[in-house]
Amino acid sequence: MIFHMYAVILQTTYFQADMRTIDNYDVKIFTDNIEEKAIEQIRRLMSIDVFSGCKIRIMTDVHAGAGCVIGFTGNLGDRVIPNIVGVDIGCGMLVQPFECSGDIDFHELNQFILSSIPSGRDIRSQEGLIQLQPYMERYQEAKELVKELRCFRELKDVKRLYKAAGTLGGGNHFIELDRDGQGRMYVVVHTGSRNLGKQVADIYQKQAVKNMFGWDKLMEKQAGMIEEYKAAGRKAELQEAIRELHNSFRMQRPPVPAELCWLEGQPREDYLHDMRLCQRWAQINRSIITDLLVEYLRAKGNISGTQEALARERFESVHNYIGDDSIIRKGAISAREGEKCIIPMNMRDGSLICTGKGNPDWNWSAPHGAGRIMSRAQAFQQLSMEAFNDSMKGIYSETVSEQTIDESPMVYKPAEEIIANIRDSADISCVIRPVFNFKAAQ
């Protein structure tokens, strides 16, 4: 029934993408289905200097986020707000198509995931690190990336971060096996930079707040004072002079809320450097998880073909990052002309495999999913397990529970709405529907 619904939508030609604009700004919102809170977040973003004069495009799956609207795309300028990219830096989805041989034992697969791929808040034990021996080169790279962060000294529990490579996380992160209309199978892994990205985002957002209170100017004065006193041979007086400088410092009130404070100059460069390392870390994380799954299925006789052949078909779509094209994408993916991408709908209806159209009016982007219409708190309060179980009939999942009800299909916008509104951004190649789903029970 789901495939029939998609087929009807894909064949129709009269759908036009709904769109809203905001007066006096170069903003387009590619849907009419947007709550007032999200509109207010967009207006607030446009009212600050960071995005004045920027071309802002808001994707179809837009919804209000923590301080910043989800579905945001815009140009990177001389100022950057770490909170725009957010705490899950480099989060995305990796897709591995394959030809399936024989029947997959889904219960055994679920047990393998539980024993080999930590999820939720869990990380790898010492024993779990042994499972990464075939991927030790990537694991070591992930470890070095952490060490190369310019904010390294401010990180907490670094040893725990080292053990997070090859782990899934919680929330909307998942592992799926999907099937297309031709019977081809897909491993799909959705995860990001785990606690590493959160720490880096928080460190730099706090620095942005401090700098806008005037802290950076105080540090400049202090550095100048140290240089001056040393040159004059007055080192003995320096400690008292610094104390007086700090006592005389008066914080300025930032012109924006704390979550929208920005970085510029060297702090901006430091953030962008560390953000890119987190993006690479997230990419490694997805690749390790995917390879663990592929090699498990190969050992069970469910996957044939060489690693090289599989690698040629593998692709991923990242949705919380700043790309080489200097486009900020917060809950949006790159959709350059000819670029293969994936747009997930929900854990029942699966995902769209698409090819980007490279539309500059969309900032060369597409939505990263269906977009929530119900908050997690609302889902826990309003949805029943009976409805959740009914919605997942025909899909093998041992993680459909009260702990994951906030990710049930009903909390997202209807798939047909997203399909109807992305025609100018991407062509849909096929629909893949889950046959197996795993999520962490928090």
Q: Locations of the language-model features?
A:
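Domain-length cofactor-binding catalytic modules of enzymes
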Residues: 15-44, 51-58, 64-70, 79-82, ...
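Acidic active-site catalytic centers that drive phospho-/nucleotidyl reactions
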Residues: 60-61, 88
